[in-house]
Amino acid sequence: MKTIAPGIQQWSFFSQEKQLNFNGLLLTVNDHCILVDPPPMETADRTAILKGYAVDYILLTNRDHVREAEACRRDFLAKVYAPEADAPLMELPVDKTYKDGELLPGGLWVIHLKDMKSPGESALFLDMGKGYLIVGDALIGRQAGQLNLLPAEKFADVNKAKASLTRLLKYNFDAILVGDGTSILADAKEAVRRAIES
C-alpha cells in the first residue's frame, strides 16, 4: 500500500490483459474509512486493513469497477455504494446508489459524466486543502504524467464524452487518482485539459 497523502492510500494490481495497473484507494477522511474501486489486494494489505481500520463504505465509480467489492464487503462488513444509473447493470447487489451532485460519506462530491462507456460513470471530488479528483474509466493513465480516454470504440460518440469531461475543469484539483494506470499528483488539471483537447 502506497501513501499518496495523509488519509489517502493506494494499492495496485497489474492487469496482464490491459497491461496497466488497476488501482484501489483506502481513504480515511472525516471520520470515515472508505475503499474506492477495490482491485485484488495482497494478503498483507488485507490483513493490515482488517487490523487497523473499520471500513464503512466501498464506493464504485462505474459498473465495470466492481472488481473485489463483494469480497471486501464480506471481509470488512462494509456497505457498497454505486452510481444510480449503473447499479441495475451490476451483478453485485448494492446497498445504496448515488447520483450527480450528491455529497457522500467522507466528504466526496459526485460528478456524473454523461456519454461515457457506462451510463453511470462518475468522478469523485475530495477537498482536503488540496483538491483530489478520483476517476474510474473516465480517464486512464497509460503513461506517467499523461491522461487518455478509453479507445473511441468504447463510446457511442467520443466527442460527447470529451464534452462531458469538461465538467471536471470546474473543480479546484491538483491531483487526479485514476482507477487504471498511473495517477498524477501535481498539475493534473492541465493533463485533463490536454486529454480533452487531444
Which residues does each PLM region occupy?
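Zn-dependent metallo-beta-lactamase
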Residues: M1-D31, L169, E190-R193
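Residues that act as N-cap/strand-start positions at coil-to-secondary-structure junctions
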Residues: Q19-N21, L92, Y98, S118
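Metallo-beta-lactamase
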Residues: S15-Q16, H32-L35, M41, Y53, ...
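Short acidic-hydrophobic, aromatic-tinged amphipathic segments that line or gate anion-handling sites
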Residues: D95-P105
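Active-site metal-binding motif and surrounding structural segment of the metallo-beta-lactamase
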Residues: E42-A82, A175
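Short loop/helix-cap segments at secondary-structure boundaries that form the rim of catalytic
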Residues: C72-D75, A87-V94
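Short, acidic/turn-prone active-site loops that include or flank metal/cofactor-
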Residues: E84-P88, L139
